[in-house]
Amino acid sequence: MNASVAIQVLPKVEGEELIGIVDEVIAYIKSTGLNMSVGPFETTIEGDYDELMDIVKECQKICIDKGAPSVMAYVKINYNPKGIWTIEKKIKKHHLEIK
């Protein structure tokens, strides 16, 4: 694993339709089988750089295929050929179980 990507898609649609399209994008990302984390503003995915770039492209295509006339995608990329810190390593200490 040499990269992580945080992606936020904003399809140009009105109201609740936005949530439905974003849900479709998240379902697609889940279907890739890669380690991922859904947040309130973006979804983070870990994997191989080239595979992640293909996923970013597909996320935008899904928005269009689901009826959005256009889509804005905000993408953050962390790439290191030698490997990256995992999502778990970065956030585990902030998500301790409440007892």
Predicted feature descriptions by range:
Residues 1-99:
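Charge-rich, low-complexity N-terminal segments
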